[in-house]
Structure formats: C-alpha cells, structure tokens
C-alpha cells in the first residue's frame, strides 16, 4: 500500500513537470548549455574625396579568461604582467573573480597576442574584435576624430555620423558542452548589418600640403595655436582643414582638450585688417566710392570718435585702391563713415559673420557682431578694421570665397556622400547657395584690388610662382582680460585665393600669438604662398609634391 502511494506520487510529479513546468525547466537547461553572443557589425570606412581610406577596421585578438579553469594563477599573472604590462593588482582582481567569462585585454597588438597563444594556458582564450585604424595618424585629426573601444564615435565625423557608421549588431546563441565549453555551433543567429561608409570632401594630398606648411609656421613662430582652411570657393567644399596643436588619432588616451579643439570652427577672435574686405565691398556695392577716389590718411595719426587711430606707417593721400593695398586703418574708417553704420552692419551679416554657416561638423559657433543700436561712438571706427567683432576661420574662408566666386555666400561642407558597403549611394551632398552678397561687378573690382595687395601692397610674400593670386593680410591685437588691447599678443592672418582670374581654391591661414614676428604679411602670407603653389600644381596635374608622393 505504501509502495502504491509512493508510485502514485511519483507519477503525479512527473505529470506536473511534463505539462506544467516543462517550458520553465527547458529554459533553465538552455541557459546552462547555451550562450548568447553579440556579433559586432563592420564599422563603416571613412574615405577622402579620392576614396583613399582615412579610417577603417582591422580584426584583432581580445584576451578573455575563465578564472575557474586557470591553474597556477600566480605564474599566469607574472607572465601576463611581463607580456602586456598590465598591473598585477588588476590581473589578480580579474582572475580571482567567480565568473565564467571576463575580459583581460582587448584589441591586442598581434605580436603580444601571438606570444600569449604560444603559452597555451588553460582558461585563457581569444575572441576576434575589430580595432579602428587611422593610417595617416595625425592627418585631418580634427575632421575625422576617433571611436572608442566599443567602436562608438567620440570625436569628429566619427561621432557626428556615428549612426551611419556604426551598423546594427547581430547575435548568435552558441551551444556549450557539459563542461560549459563553447562549441563552434550555433542554435540561432541574426546576422549583423554593416555600417555605411563616409566619403569626405577633403583631398588627402592637399590636406597633407596644408598641414605641412601650417606645422612649419606654428613651430617657427612659437605660436600658441594655428588653423588653416582650403576651400573650393564655387561650391563650399572643404578641401583641407587643420589646426595646431594636434594629436595622433591612433593614440589619443593622454591628449589634452586644447589639442583636440577644432579651432577653425570654434575659436573666436578679432580678425583685424582681413575684415577690411567687408567695408571695401560694401562701399563699392553702394557706389559710395570708386577705385580712384582719394582719401587723406592724416600722415598716420587721426583723432576721431573719441579715440586716436594709427596706421602702421604714415600715409598722406591714398586712392581707395591704395587704402586697401596698404591696409590703412585711417583710410578704411573714412570709407566706412561714407557707408554708415546700418549699411556696414548689413554687409557684415551678409558676408556670413554673426551666424553659423551650417557646416556638417559639430562645434561651430556663430561669432559676434552687435547691431548698430548697441554700438558705442567708437564702433564705426573699430568694426571696419576688424575690431569689436568676433569671427571664426571658417567664416573668413566663406567670406573671401564670396569675392572669389563672383558674389555668392556658399554653405561650407565636409561630407561628400554616404555609401553602403557595396559603394551604392545613400546620400549625396551638393553645393548650397546661402544668398547673394554683392554683384559680380563689385566682386571683380575687389578681386583686382586684392591682387594689388599681393603685387604692390602688404601681401608680397603671398605671391604664387606661376599663378596669379589675390588676398588680404591681417595683424590683430588681442584683447587682455581687462578689456585693453595687448602690445605683445597678436593674431596674424592671411586670406586669399588663386589663380586670381579664375580661382580654384581659397585659403585662410590664422596663427595665434606668433613671435618674435607677428605681422600677417610675414607669418601667414608665406603659408598661403606655399600651399597655393603646391595644391594648384597638384590639382592641375602638373606636379605632385615629392613628400606626398613618398607617402
């Protein structure tokens, strides 16, 4: 009887398990014998405009441990400490945890990975992960940026276009044997979706030329910082953009925030005399002056609006053309007085100052220009020559392009297109006209004057051998914290385009706090000259710089 009752209970228990608890117990068993593994998608490649890879993925070994399987942990810790340089305390902590899987080191150098594999230590294993590689290290670092350990973009277009580049992870359920060892068989799998590729507007060779010359000026003049932009004036395409200081995209763990800052789009400064192109363009467009109108430049000293203006060298009578060629502050202010505050402000804004231009890089700032109702009595004597206004290098590049292209403000852009892994086009960026600024006639007349700046005026060191060029020098005193202008801190600049008659590119060079020399015509103009010379020859197919060819 007792046996019968026991048998009945067993049958009842089996019936309960079979029909009421089977799904629960099956899930428990699967958890013990299956492992869900995320499958990493391929992160998209970043190319220059000629489809030369600037960032791509490489398969690397990542080292993991199953702590319970490792014997002689002290010896293993010593070996890994020697090979990987990891702290003993870190290894001791990881290897003494009660886990079935724990990372020790990810995306290893192939030599280190091979050395550990030769040791054949039970309880250590490797999984393939992808590491982001930047083949040109420092080149275009402030454009490209970088991604982190988990291939998530952290800076530059790597961050701004992460949703395009990252792809969609897949997953697989791998079977395990009775000892919990993963078998190379899966029960279910969802294939990852690869990320999309980015094609930039920059040209690797022009970028190299620009960085080479900027780096030389930055070091030769012991500068605090420097920026350069090379742009197609007709479209707004950025052909090169660089800053100093910079950093290595493959080794950014110890980089300062100052080195990572994209100064060309986020640093605000008073432009000084390069800003005179706005005053000059507005005066010609409004028919307030002609090229041959004469201005008395007060022999270098002029008391006006409660302040005293000085020219860097005394001038008497100068034509309007000569006022710009010789960069006369006094002459420029007299021209601005003819134009008036409201019209001057109109042209400052029309040239793109005081608002964001909309470049497809994060961090752009709008700059600073107050409306006339907030001007002081000295503003009409300051703004025309680039004081009381804050600008970026990008805004100057777009502004000088207005003169180069016949009067149009173009939206600058850095992304040419987005493509899938097969190269099929997903998105194509095209030139965008923001608005018309001045007439073609005014642009042509200013172009001739700016050609004279290089031929006869302050920009002689910007003269490009074999090609005509036009441009404007700038030497701006920096503001001290107390609001006064410094006598030993300057921003040297040059903005220009070449060839003058049919411009291929515009170039802006900004050097912050150079010394001992600080004049734009001495510090920045030679950078323009060398970049324009080499870049135009490269574009025309006449000559490739030897250094670029070697690369």
Roles of regions detected by a PLM:
Residues 1-252, 268, 342-354, 363, ...:
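Periplasmic/cell-envelope proteins involved in peptidoglycan metabolism and beta-lactam response
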Residues 53-55, 176-187, 228-273, 278-513, ...:
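Beta-lactam-recognizing serine transpeptidase/beta-lactamase-like catalytic domain environment
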């Amino acid at each position: 009887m007792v046996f019968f009752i026991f048998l009945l209970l067993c049958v009842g228990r089996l019936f309960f398990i079979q029909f009421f608890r089977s799904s629960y117990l099956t899930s428990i068993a699967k958890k013990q014998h299956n492992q869900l593994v995320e499958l990493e998608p391929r992160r998209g490649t970043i190319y220059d405009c000629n489809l030369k890879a600037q960032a791509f993925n490489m398969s690397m070994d990542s080292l993991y441990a199953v702590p319970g399987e490792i014997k002689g942990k002290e010896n293993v810790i010593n070996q890994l400490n020697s090979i990987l340089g990891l702290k003993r305390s870190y290894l001791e902590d990881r290897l003494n945890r009660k886990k079935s899987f724990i990372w020790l080191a990810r995306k290893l150098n192939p030599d280190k990975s091979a050395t550990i594999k030769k040791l054949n230590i039970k309880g250590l294993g490797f999984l393939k992960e992808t590491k982001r590689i930047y083949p040109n290290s420092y080149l275009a670092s402030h454009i490209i940026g970088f991604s982190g350990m988990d291939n998530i973009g952290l800076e530059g277009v790597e961050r701004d276009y992460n949703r395009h580049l990252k792809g969609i992870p897949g997953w697989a359920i791998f079977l395990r044997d009775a000892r919990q060892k993963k078998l190379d068989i899966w029960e279910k799998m969802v294939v990852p979706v690869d990320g999309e590729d980015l094609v930039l507007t920059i040209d690797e060779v022009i970028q190299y030329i620009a960085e080479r010359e900027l780096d030389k000026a930055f070091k030769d003049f012991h500068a605090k910082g420097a920026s350069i932009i090379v742009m197609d004036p007709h479209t707004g395409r950025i052909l090169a953009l660089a800053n100093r200081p910079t950093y290595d995209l493959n080794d950014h763990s110890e980089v300062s925030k100052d080195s990572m800052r994209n100064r060309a789009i986020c640093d605000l400064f008073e432009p000084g005399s390069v800003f005179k192109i706005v005053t000059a363009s507005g005066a010609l467009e409004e028919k307030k002056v002609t090229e041959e109108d004469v201005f008395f430049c007060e022999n270098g000293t002029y008391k006006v609006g409660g302040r005293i203006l000085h020219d860097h060298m005394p001038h008497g009578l100068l034509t309007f053309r000569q006022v710009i060629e010789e960069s006369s502050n006094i002459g420029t202010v007299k021209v601005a007085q003819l134009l008036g505050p409201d019209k001057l402000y109109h042209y400052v804004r029309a040239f793109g100052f005081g608002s964001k231009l909309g470049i497809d890089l994060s961090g752009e700032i709008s700059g600073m220009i107050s409306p006339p109702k907030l001007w002081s009595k000295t503003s009409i004597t300051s703004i025309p020559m680039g004081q009381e206004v804050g600008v970026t290098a990008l805004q100057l590049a777009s502004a000088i392009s207005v003169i180069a292209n016949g009067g149009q403000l173009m939206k600058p852009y850095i992304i040419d297109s987005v493509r899938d892994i097969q190269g099929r086009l997903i998105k194509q960026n095209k030139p965008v006209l923001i608005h018309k600024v001045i007439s073609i006639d005014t642009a042509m007349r200013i172009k001739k004057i700016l050609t004279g700046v290089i031929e006869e005026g302050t920009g002689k060191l910007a003269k490009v051998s074999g090609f005509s060029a036009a441009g404007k020098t700038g030497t701006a005193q920096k503001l001290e914290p107390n609001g006064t202008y410094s006598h030993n801190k300057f921003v040297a600049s040059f903005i220009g385009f070449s060839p003058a008659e049919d411009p291929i590119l515009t170039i802006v060079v900004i050097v912050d706090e150079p010394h001992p020399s600080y004049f734009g015509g001495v510090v920045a103009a030679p950078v323009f000259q060398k970049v324009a010379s080499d870049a135009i020859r490269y574009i025309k197919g006449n000559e490739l710089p030897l250094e670029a060819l070697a690369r």
